[in-house]
Curated annotation (Swiss-Prot):
Assigned keywords, A-Z: Cytoplasm, Membrane, Nucleus, Transmembrane, Transmembrane helix
Protein name (record): Integrator complex subunit 2
Quaternary context: Component of the Integrator complex, composed of core subunits INTS1, INTS2, INTS3, INTS4, INTS5, INTS6, INTS7, INTS8, INTS9/RC74, INTS10, INTS11/CPSF3L, INTS12, INTS13, INTS14 and INTS15. The core complex associates with protein phosphatase 2A subunits PPP2CA and PPP2R1A, to form the Integrator-PP2A (INTAC) complex.
Organism, as annotated: Gallus gallus
Any GO BP: snRNA 3'-end processing
Topology versus the membrane: Single-pass membrane protein
UniProt subcellular location: Nucleus; Nucleus membrane; Cytoplasm
Primary location group: nucleus
Transmembrane regions: 420-436
Keyword presence, Transmembrane helix: yes
Pfam families: INTS2
Record bears the keyword Ubl conjugation: no
One annotated Gene Ontology cellular component of this protein: nuclear membrane
Similarity comment: Belongs to the Integrator subunit 2 family.
Amino acid sequence: MAECSGLQFVSPYAFEAMQKVDVVRLAALSDPELRLLLPCLVRMALCAPADQSQSWAQDKKLILRLLSGVEAVNSIVALLSVDFHALEQDASKEQQLRHKLGGGSGESILVSQLQHGLTLEFEHSDSPRRLRLVLSELLAIMNKVSESNGEFFLKSSELFESPVYLEEAADVLCILQAELPSLLPIVDVAEALLHVKNGAWFLCLLVANVPDSFNEVCRGLIKNGERQDEESVGGRRRTEALRHLCKMNPSQALRVRGMVVEECHLPGLGVALTLDHTKNESSDDGVSDLVCFVSGLLLGTNAKVRTWFGTFIRNGQQRKRDNISSVLWQMRRQLLLELMGILPTVRSTHIVEEADVDTEPNVSVYSGLKEEHVVKASALLRLYCALMGIAGLKPTDEEAEQLLQLMTSRPPATPAGVRFVSLSFCMLLAFSTLVSTPEQEQLMVMWLSWMIKEEAYFESISGVSASFGEMLLLVAMYFHSNQLSAIIDLVCSTLGMKIVIKPSSLSRMKTIFTQEIFTEQVVTAHAVRVPVTGSLSANITGFLPIHCIYQLLRSRSFTKHKVSIKDWIYRQLCETTTPLHPQLLPLIDVYINSILTPASKSNPEATNQPVTEQEILNVFQGLTGGENTRPAQRYSITTQLLVLYYVLSYEEALLANTKILAAMQRKPKSYSSALMDQIPIKYLIRQAQGLQQELGGLHSALLRLLATNYPHLCIVEDWICEEQITGTDALLRRMLLTTIAKNHSPKQLQEAFSMLPGNHTQLMQILEHLTLLSAGELIPYAEVLTSNMNCLLNAGVPRRILQTVNKLWMVLNTVMPRRLWVMTVNALQPSVKIVRQQKYTQNDLMIDPLIVLRCDQRVHRSPPLMDITLHMLNGYLLASKAYLNAHLKETAEQDIRPSQNNAMGPETPEVTREELKNALLAAQDSAAVQILLEICLPTEEEKAQSSSTYSLLKSVQSTTSPKSSDVEEEEDSLLCNLREVQCLICCLLHQMYIADPNIVKLVHFQGYPCELLALTVAGIPSMHICLDFIPELIAQPELEKQIFAIQLLSFLCIQYALPKSLSVARLAINVMGTLLTVLTQSKRYAFFMPTLPCLVSFCQAFPPLYEDIMSLLIQIGQVCASDVATQTRDFDPIITRLQQLKERPNEVSGLCKDSPYKSCSRDITSVDPDVQLCQCVESTIIEIINMSVSGV
């Protein structure tokens, strides 16, 4: 708005005085300044104040005295004397009339019969008419604005353009707005004033006379403004008006700028206000407000703001660049001045060339960047990156030259200096077009050479672990491996912004790096000499040596140039702490891959060396003693977990690549089992579980490796037990820990065990105290506990001691399971073996898990110790599977050698070995099950002691009669132990059956004593799966298997009365009927005598089978009777009774206890087998009838 250039605006001093009603400051104003504020001051002096205080009364007197000498006050007083109510009514009528006429000019109610022009009319009019003239003109403009639909127009108005009457028109405008606020909202008036000449001046006067409306007016103008103000006349006028307002009230300029960003309107205004603010602020060495503001817009998180401002930059570049009046040009000029203001003074290429000859290498003739300018220089670089990369700014030649001068300057060795060099380097990569001449390219190469030479010095002086040297090395490696996308990601990450970089733009930089500065051999040799990062953790950000080593390992540079990297990696693993750095696990994985697989087939020996066993053991020294020795440990838990991850991953990868390595005739060394036995794997996993948040994905990776290679350490029961041991209850109990409990030594525990036959109290007391210790603190007592377990098998040891030992063993099992199992198995050997000193190793037990069951027979009747034995058996069965799988993979070369001359192809040997392994595992599992089932049988001694013990196996649901004598109490105890052991075994068998249903089928096809069927069916919930294969078992040719199948089915039908059971029972009845017709006399007796009682169970479970079963029984009786009839006719009465039983069961049911039926089973052994079978049939029918009649 150049038309306002000759007018006097309200000064910031005067506006502040009006805001604060500072009468003293107002009195100090000059007459021209005071003239602009008269409307408000006169109203203030004449209107009744709300403030009735004495101080305001004094101030009001000063204001009246101030106004008394001003001539224009009289005209303003006359304006205030008008009837504004009538004026408002007339204005409302005119508005309604204009609305009816469609906005046409028409006849005005406010002003009628204008004799002359508006200016002359205003001059000759009195105060009321002047008010009407201005109001009519203002309402007309406001109506036109509301009808314009956002299109800007400039309204010609004599009243607002005549320089003679501007002040009087402004007085009238201010009075009208103050007296008629509902008719003339100040925001609408402000919007209308933008459309007239001198509108900005009128707007400033209006706001100055209503200072409280400043923020409201500014927000309204911004909200109604254009998204891009530089593109239109209206936008530029709006920006200029708001800029004048902010000059009048500079304290609110930044708040107005915030409104601009919030609304995403008028970007030029935001920049202009920032430029005004930058000129006013003191010129210090810090980052300017302009740099901060523009950086915040382009690098902030609000994508809408970023797009809006980027559009402003792009549109501004499309206009003429020499348009000095544009805000964008002013911004670029200011930024360039700031950039040039911090540049070093001496910057000449030829000086450097002379320096290379005449000066020492450590002396630089460059004027380095001043330390106080480094942060500002970094901020400017990032801003220019954002302007060029995000907003699309195309730098001028001057800007490009100055930017390159700044980027290749040399900062001091401080953390900020390291950051500046990193930013400069990434900016060179991102915007290689800044280097356009050979001289500039030479300057860049020299600067890069200086970076290489100085990076170690910078790192040592600045104390920053992430130096720019690692970034240089990393970029060089990426260029050598042609990973241009990785370089782009690196640049964007360092600059902190996502910008588009074309890979083709990096071609020249790639040539410079790979041929002039960093050859691959130089990169590799330099990388291995880079010191490891001390206390490496995720808290250390930036690009570190580990990133460089990782990339070199991936590209196989170390093996290609025969550089050993093993020691560097080992040192770095030893220098780690929590939180875990995310690059460590990928580094270990790629290192393992470089050990096992050569870089090329032509050179199979080109691999890295693995970490030695002694180096691995060094990391875990002092750990086997438990938690009480942790302070003496040399290495952190992070290092130990990483080395454990390395060992487990190495072994897994070695097994996975066995075939490939065998084909290449390579066999890398595997770590010995002795080494693995010395690593406390479970203890370390427990430690990792408590540090999951700090270890990132390491804990889950270790669990995966453990489940694959050490399934016996991932038993579900162990995890559940561990939750109980480490839970709240255990923590509360540990709070009861006394000094006495802590003072018990393993030696005292041994002495207490030695006193066992006579004194139980001391041992019980020590064991109870030990239960309060944590798992790690119990480790020193493990050997004493296990070595004395054999003593606990003697008679008279209290059950409480056994249970406490079991509890302590389970706690120790959470931290040292493998060593604990070996010690326990050796301790529970029979006495004869202990004398021979036959000690089993971990390897022995994995090869033959059944060793666990070759323990002292007394263990089989000690439930707490049997629980431990079963736990170990389950673990070693799982370990044996993993061991055999690993062994199969380790010996894969045996598959390859024969297959080379085998016409059958390479698959045949592998399938055979796999089948052999599966057969061995099946035999092993089934043998374990058969031994456990045998343990469930009562011994001859137990049978002799109590007949009720044996009857328990017949019926699980039967209850024992109460005993009264003291001798029977001992039998009851024996029965209780046997029952408890049976329950423990059934629980384990259930788990094994669920884990592998094939075991169930194999065991039942092998068969076991029928006395155990009642126990297994009732005690093992998964026995119902036997229904799937019973038809196949019945179809076997062996008579014993058929009998066993029918007996098993009878118990299953009672336990699981399902439709499937019914169908299988029908099949069994049909098979029995078929066999009746084909079996010889001896086989018929052998088959039907044990299976006939099963028919009672079928009938009990499924009453619909009654008719079929009765028919079968009659058929059996008839067949047997026919054989007897050939010898004698005395058998007819039995056949007659059988027919009566079938035809009239209700009549006979009451007589079942009479002598004819009661004597049917007597003297069975003294008669012919057919007679015995007939009597058994009769007994079975009677039992079925009794059952059906009684409703059982």
